[in-house]
Amino acid sequence: MSHYPASGTWQACPKCGRHVHQRQWGTYQQCPYCHYWQRLTTAQRLEQLVDEGSFQPLTMTERPVNQLGFPDYTNKLRRAQRQTGLNEAVVCGTALIEQQPCILAVMDSHFMMGTLNTAVTRRLLHASEQARAQRLPLIIVTASGGARMQEGVYALVGMNLILAELARLAATPLPLITVLTDPTMGGVSASFAFKGDLIIAEAGAKIGFAGARVIQQTLPVKLPADFQTADQLFKNGMVDAVVERPQLRSTLGQALANYGIGRSAHG
């Protein structure tokens, strides 16, 4: 008789290929055989990071628009919205993490690979503006393939707009914490992902600009086994810490407590 649960679904682990029952992935979505971390949805990430019932979404009316008339983009947006239950690739709100208040922005790679576009840009701008207005720390959890090609230069301009707003945030005592999760690539890694006062990489995350396959097709080089990994970035001083997923919440809570900004501003 099989020792696996009788009901539920199975999935092949993207890394080791073993078949894993949905219950075996556990709360933190980790393969029990090779310890590969599944990519989380926004809902899963919020459940793991914030104090229960504390997340309050910011009011945001920005919606994606097919400004360039890109073929089939509108249909792809509708499909992504239907499959994820989101209307864009980032969710922003106020939250408590270990009883420490903050503004939290969480990107979702399940929505068109979490790509940066006009609507995502405006939401991140609003999150930073609210951090300044409410005198709260800002945490951005990145999960993105980069800029959204269907919005062309509009998506690229978003990189600079976000950097300009984060410069205004940096002129205040308010901290910016970036949490780099799998994947953090392209225009997101090239712009705001590494602008944090504290930069945390989730263990196992792939972080870089161009993907390894693109680089190897362009340059006749053999890339190291740990290329574009969280551990490699830590070894080279690009991130402040590599944290396992189960420890992320307590790590962020301790960091917020050390800064002491949100609690002092809100009693």
From Swiss-Prot:
Family annotation (InterPro entries): AcCoA_carboxyl_beta (IPR034733), Acetyl_CoA_COase_Trfase_b_su (IPR000438), ClpP/crotonase-like_dom_sf (IPR029045), COA_CT_N (IPR011762)
Chain ranges of zinc fingers (C4-type): 13-34
Annotated S-S bridges: none
Sites where the protein binds Zn(2+): 13, 16, 31, 34
GO CC terms: acetyl-CoA carboxylase complex
Summary of subunit composition and partner proteins: Acetyl-CoA carboxylase is a heterohexamer composed of biotin carboxyl carrier protein (AccB), biotin carboxylase (AccC) and two subunits each of ACCase subunit alpha (AccA) and ACCase subunit beta (AccD).
Protein name: Acetyl-coenzyme A carboxylase carboxyl transferase subunit beta 1
Organism from which the protein derives: Lactiplantibacillus plantarum (strain JDM1)
Lineage: Bacteria, Bacillati, Bacillota, Bacilli, Lactobacillales
